[in-house]
Amino acid sequence: MKITVIGAGNVGATTAFRIADKKLARELVLLDVVEGIPQGKGLDMYETGPVGLFDTKITGSNDYADTADSDIVIITAGLPRKPGMTREDLLMKNAGIVKEVTDNIMKHSKNPIIIVVSNPLDIMTHVAWVRSGLPKERVIGMAGVLDAARFRSFIAMELGVSMQDINACVLGGHGDAMVPVVKYTTVAGIPISDLLPAETIDKLVERTRNGGAEIVEHLKQGSAFYAPASSVVEMVESIVLDRKRVLPCAVGLEGQYGIDKTFVGVPVKLGRNGVEQIYEINLDQADLDLLQKSAKIVDENCKMLESTIG
């Protein structure tokens, strides 16, 4: 199994290291446009092999030729939003980056599974799908896995219980448009509504929506990377080991939930072939309305990018 991570920043490098440490790849490529960064980080990771007991071949590179014949490619490359930059500016710049990255990936790998982490995530996943020409089941956005992890951690914090006993369902867009589905959120099989008052649940939902911004506020510079990287690796593990995990991911819908030709976060089965099944679960009307609203925002932004992404 050969896995490539595009972007050697905090998210990309942490993702690459966790993949190596969990022995999920025979060969791992960390690629970045900045010379020296992927080479140095890649070598540093490789030198942990004797301690971590893994033999993964790790290559840091600035040359897409080194990514040839990758089975999985993870795109983390992109710019953060800067002061004075409009959302439209960010969309255009990152769409251009993801377009170029995807074009270069496809020059060297015929049929990879592409996992997109770059923001705005659902829209960038659409860009990668359009440019790659791959079937929708092979282009996946990391969305709800991270959001559900945050929701679960906040619930555990509130109740003082193990995170392992908490299951949460978060659908929709990654960010303000996410839809934490309370009725499918449980603690050891017990509905969360039986354990916490509605106003507390509402506060936890809102904190989940602002989870990324909360970390940015603490850090002052930079954004979250441990939890995003761990979420990507959970997806990679399910694909590589054919685990058939049911995880919330941004995928291209074709009529499910009344949404068509739009990438949005829903529960899917992830296995060796990528997205092997999309689950259309029963939602309350309020949650369905929020999910469709989230998809509409993604669709509008994608239409704005049509001339950019070809």
UniProtKB/Swiss-Prot annotation:
Top-level EC class as recorded in UniProt: oxidoreductase
- Family in the record: Belongs to the LDH/MDH superfamily. MDH type 3 family.
Q: Which Gene3D superfamilies match?
A: Lactate dehydrogenase/glycoside hydrolase, family 4, C-terminal, NAD(P)-binding Rossmann-like Domain
What is the protein's species of origin?
A: Chlorobaculum parvum (strain DSM 263 / NCIMB 8327) (Chlorobium vibrioforme subsp. thiosulfatophilum)
Q: Which GO terms describe its molecular function?
A: L-lactate dehydrogenase activity; L-malate dehydrogenase (NAD+) activity
Which EC number applies? 1.1.1.37
**UniProt function note:** Catalyzes the reversible oxidation of malate to oxaloacetate.
Which InterPro entries is this protein grouped with?
Answer: L-lactate/malate_DH, Lactate/malate_DH_C, Lactate/malate_DH_N, Lactate_DH/Glyco_Ohase_4_C, Malate_DH_type3, NAD(P)-bd_dom_sf
Q: Which GO terms describe its biological process?
A: lactate metabolic process; tricarboxylic acid cycle
Which CDD domains is this protein grouped with? LDH-like_MDH
Claim: NAD is one of the keywords in the record: yes
What name goes with this protein? Malate dehydrogenase
Keywords, alphabetical:
NAD, Oxidoreductase, Tricarboxylic acid cycle
| Entry binding sites for substrate | 81, 87, 119, 150
Catalytic activity, as annotated: (S)-malate + NAD(+) = oxaloacetate + NADH + H(+)
Organism placement in taxonomy = Bacteria, Pseudomonadati, Chlorobiota, Chlorobiia, Chlorobiales
Q: Which domain of life is it from?
A: Bacteria
Quaternary state and interactors: Homotetramer; arranged as a dimer of dimers.
Which residues take part in binding NAD(+)?
Answer: 7-12, 32, 94, 117-119
Report any Pfam family annotated for this entry. Ldh_1_C
